[in-house]
A protein has these predicted regions:
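Bacterial N-terminal signal peptides that target proteins for export
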Residues: 1-10
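Bacterial N-terminal signal peptides
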Residues: 9-20
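Active-site neighborhoods and metal-handling regions in enzymes and metal-associated proteins
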Residues: 25-302
């Protein structure tokens, strides 16, 4: 009988473990599929428009092992052994040609967004065949997310393509900004979900669920918020949430061991990351004093 019970418990544990793995894989796959949908819509609807508006007929994004470009998530990731390239070329047709050179994994192939996928290529030959007049690269003076090309990678591109094409390099700063900022329907839906998660966690943080006046610290609230992000696999926009007490003279304390008291006016400034979207949200709360049932007039009319 004892052995039967042990076997039953072992089988139950196995079922629970398998079920847990299946659920986790389900969410991972859903996110991958959602990014694929977004990528397809962006490539179909936004990419031709922004390349032509910016008078660019080739856009090269370099991916290097250990050094991902900020746009890698947008373009589909994949394994890079040394150097890999996402190359978009306007060849005069309605659809922009999309190529992935030197970037592997079945996920890149299965996302269905690319016309050309190979790990065996001659970069100069590829570019010469298309003979672009303006080659946009990801270097930028003002926008960090458009400045993913390292100096070393820039030099390598110039050597590999030769002076003729190196003289045609232009910044992709405006192109990147336009591509990222023009949202398609699937992006708006995904961003709305990220915003709702951000709002929900922030408002729970400023409630009796988390805060006990005279006991809970600002750091306690901030760490609780971070824990919620980990539980549902959300990234962070700014690292540790900024949870602070504020007043007429500005910040009194910020995400530290300051104990929250009745009468404190609290604020949160934070954001979550979901897919390649990052929120930026603020919330405020007042901790009622003993006997208070409403916000003081001074706060309501602030």
């Amino acid at each position: 009988m004892k052995n039967a019970v042990v076997k039953f418990l072992a089988a139950l544990a196995f079922v629970i473990l398998v079920s847990g793995v299946a659920n986790a894989a389900g969410e991972a796959q859903r996110r991958w599929e959602r990014m694929n949908q977004i990528r397809q819509e962006k490539f179909d609807l936004v990419l031709p428009e922004v390349m032509r508006e910016n008078k660019v007929d080739m856009w090269i994004t370099v991916s290097r092992e250990g050094h991902d470009d900020p746009l890698t998530e947008d373009f589909g990731k994949g394994y890079v052994g040394s150097y890999g390239y996402y190359i978009f070329t306007d060849r005069g047709e309605e659809r922009i040609e999309r190529a992935v050179l030197g970037i592997g994994t079945a996920l890149v192939e299965d996302n269905g967004a690319y016309d050309i996928m190979t790990e065996s290529f001659d970069l100069r030959e590829f570019v010469e065949e298309r003979d672009p007049q303006f080659i946009a690269l990801n270097y930028a003076e003002h926008i960090g997310a458009a400045d993913g090309l390292s100096h070393t990678s820039y030099q390598k591109l110039a050597r590999d393509l030769g002076k003729k094409y190196a003289d045609r390099f232009v910044s992709a700063e405006k192109l990147t900004s336009d591509f990222r900022s023009r949202r398609v329907a699937s992006e708006i839906a995904a961003f709305a979900w990220a915003g709702e998660m951000s709002r929900n966690i922030a408002e729970r943080a400023f409630s009796n669920e988390v805060i006990t006046p005279g006991k809970t610290t600002l750091a306690d609230v901030a760490w609780w918020m971070r824990e919620q992000q980990f539980e549902i696999n959300l990234g962070t926009s700014f690292g540790m949430p900024s949870v602070y007490i504020t007043g007429p003279d500005g910040f009194v304390a910020l995400s530290n061991d300051h104990v929250i008291q009745r009468g404190d006016f609290l604020a949160i400034d934070w954001g979550v990351g979901y897919l390649n979207f990052y929120t930026d949200m603020k919330r405020h709360a007042y901790v009622l004093k003993e006997g208070e049932t409403h916000l003081p007039d001074s706060i309501q009319k602030a």
